[in-house]
């Protein structure tokens, strides 16, 4: 009985309730490890993706910066000519001393490129004439303008001026007190249309239609808008993204961006080949005996015709050494006799042949 009691107490089977608990612990530990690995992979992938996006944005901003610098210092007149030819002619006028400046604009990335025309005063004052500043309320010109414009348009103009004053608070020279007010007033007059007494010289956006397709600038702006990089930009991208170490390198980068590149003219080879090249070509396949004989005959005939042409081009020899082959045949083209004659006088020979042919023709006609 003692033996049986020992066996049951020490070596008996474990209960079923203990096994699932251990399995649950192992499964939960494995699931926690797998979940941690997935989380680590997701975080690492997000870090790599974020770093890649930062690199792409930085490289794109560098290319756009090259575009702005090249547009301002190299091809400002060419770009303005496509936007407005009259303003481009004004830019070329040496008495005006105008300058076009390009900047970035926009609330999202990538930014858009805008431009504006500035007039260098060089300590000289320029006066812009506008009815808003010249027509005083107490002058007779206001009454005349009221009669010409009409009551409706006149009151609309007054209401618009009051709306601009309430919105910006600085809409006239009398409102300027500090330098900040003066800068705000200048920007307001630039953006205000000419019909309302402004200069109508606001920041305008540079579109793809204003850039020539032959320039690298077009590929850069297209890459910023569509996200598709061209083959031409892909080749020069590595060099353009480098930091310029010298002034020559910086100018070379700007020259690459603004240089006009004409499309290369590809030479189209004809489908046919000249007869000189056909002679050099060798047939690689097998030929039958008949084909080989035919080719040999054609070669012989070609050589004979070539020799005859060469002999005909030689200077003619004396009449005494000319050989002539005479063939006698019937009207049914049956050959009677072939003779080789060497005569000194060709005219006598022709006369004899003509007489012989006449006799033969008379005899042949008498048979019928």
From Swiss-Prot:
Residues 1-22, 282-317 are annotated as: Disordered. This is Uncharacterized protein CXorf58 homolog. Residues 293-311 have a biased composition (Basic and acidic residues). It comes from Mus musculus (Mouse).
